[in-house]
């Protein structure tokens, strides 16, 4: 591919779908703190004045779902009815059942190492050397824009900002290399007291310029800041939100394939989540080791079966050693059974609420972002 454009988007923690994701993962974390072996599939729906939390949970833990929900909304910043949503006054409904025993009998085993996959499915992981976090640049910078929006909202730099926001960044490439940013879109909810020209200038100076590298911005770069002219009604008052509806934002911004399974609200026995994390871990270590510049991993599973039904590795012609060597290195050095994924990445910890906004990948605080297999891979491939 010669010259081309590629675009990715992100949304803020105050976006309705992300509110739902964060509530689902906050419930998961609270349960895992008490019962690491719990089975959790927690879904959330939010709309004006109400939250519904439902799903299937089997656990010895007791958690206060209403208080967890309110505290999560409070932390995001919806604490005033003028915003259309208020953590202190919204209704919280709960509809929780237990995991089906038909599923459970296929997952749990006498030998925990033979833990079966919680469902069938396909999962992808990806890494690229175009950023320092080995992620595609468009989604990386889209996340950073809405993270910056939240920061200047919460620290009072721009006190008229409100929690809901979206970003979109279009990068220009030539022969696979970034040559600049073609377009930037940032839409942010705001109070009724701010004029559009003032908002646009403040967003440019306090959000966009501090985030996007100056060398990629040119006089041809197009900026669209609140292009509708008004964004006062937002959050759950503007749109309903559902868990699992931002799966491309959560992953690679469309730069890699996606198996279709969402992450939030699912315990690590669900390979939709744990295997996607493991696939990212494997791909990132391959790229960090220098064995390829780009790497995509596909894993697949059958419900109740421990071993993956397939492993596929694609390096897009960027491999520096034989493709067969890379495949052998992965098969012989990574345990990709559900138990192996959980042990390898220490996934029974209550770490998931932090993942539920601004992307699950490219953030060094998460264990699947470690590059601790680099030397092993280089030694195996005899690559120095």
Curated annotation (Swiss-Prot):
One of its GO terms (biological process) is S-adenosylmethionine biosynthetic process. The keyword Cytoplasm applies. GO terms for molecular function: ATP binding; magnesium ion binding; methionine adenosyltransferase activity. K(+) binds at residue 43. CDD domains: S-AdoMet_synt. Binds 2 divalent ions per subunit. Binds 1 potassium ion per subunit. It catalyses: L-methionine + ATP + H2O = S-adenosyl-L-methionine + phosphate + diphosphate. Its cofactor is Mg(2+); K(+). GO terms for cellular component: cytoplasm. Residues 99-109 are annotated as: Flexible loop. L-methionine binds at residues 56, 99, 239, 270. It is found in: Cytoplasm. Mg(2+) binds at residue 17. Its EC number is 2.5.1.6. Pathway: Amino-acid biosynthesis; S-adenosyl-L-methionine biosynthesis; S-adenosyl-L-methionine from L-methionine: step 1/1. HAMAP family: S_AdoMet_synth1 (MF_00086). Belongs to the AdoMet synthase family. Homotetramer; dimer of dimers. Catalyzes the formation of S-adenosylmethionine (AdoMet) from methionine and ATP. The overall synthetic reaction is composed of two sequential steps, AdoMet formation and the subsequent tripolyphosphate hydrolysis which occurs prior to release of AdoMet from the enzyme. This is S-adenosylmethionine synthase. The lineage of its organism: Bacteria, Pseudomonadati, Pseudomonadota, Gammaproteobacteria, Vibrionales.
């Amino acid at each position: 591919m010669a010259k081309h454009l590629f675009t990715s988007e992100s949304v803020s923690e105050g976006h309705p779908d992300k509110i739902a994701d964060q509530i689902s993962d906050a419930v998961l974390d609270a349960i895992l703190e008490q019962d690491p072996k719990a089975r959790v599939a927690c879904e959330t729906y939010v709309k004006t004045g109400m939250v519904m939390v439902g799903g299937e949970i089997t656990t010895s833990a007791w958690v206060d779902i209403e208080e967890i929900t309110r505290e999560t909304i409070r932390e995001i910043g919806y604490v005033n009815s003028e915003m259309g949503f208020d953590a202190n006054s919204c209704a919280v409904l709960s509809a929780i059942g237990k995991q089906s025993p038909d599923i459970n009998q296929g997952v749990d085993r006498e030998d925990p190492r033979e833990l079966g996959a919680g469902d069938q499915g396909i999962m992808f992981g990806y890494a690229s050397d175009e950023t320092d976090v080995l992620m595609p640049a468009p989604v990386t910078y889209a996340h950073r824009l809405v993270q910056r929006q939240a920061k200047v909202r919460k620290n009072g730099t721009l006190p008229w900002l409100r929690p809901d926001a979206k970003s979109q960044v279009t990068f220009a490439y030539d022969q696979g290399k970034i040559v600049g940013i073609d377009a930037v879109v940032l839409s942010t909810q705001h109070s009724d007291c701010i004029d559009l020209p003032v908002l646009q200038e403040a967003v440019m100076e306090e959000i966009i310029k501090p985030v996007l590298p100056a060398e990629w911005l040119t006089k041809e770069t197009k900026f669209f800041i609140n292009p509708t002219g008004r964004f006062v009604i937002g959050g759950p008052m503007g749109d309903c939100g559902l868990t699992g509806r931002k799966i491309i934002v959560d992953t690679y911004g469309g730069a890699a394939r996606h198996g279709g399974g969402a992450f939030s609200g699912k315990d690590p026995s669900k390979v939709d989540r744990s295997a996607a994390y493991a696939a990212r871990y494997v791909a990132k270590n391959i790229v960090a080791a220098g064995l390829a510049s780009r790497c995509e991993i596909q894993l697949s599973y059958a419900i109740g079966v421990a071993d993956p039904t397939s492993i596929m590795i694609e390096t897009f012609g960027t491999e520096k050693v034989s493709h067969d060597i890379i495949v052998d290195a992965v098969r012989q050095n990574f345990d990709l059974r559900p138990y192996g994924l959980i042990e390898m990445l220490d996934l029974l910890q209550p770490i998931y609420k932090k993942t539920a906004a601004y992307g699950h990948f490219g953030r060094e605080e998460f264990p699947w972002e470690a590059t601790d297999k680099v030397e092993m891979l280089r030694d195996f491939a005899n690559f120095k």
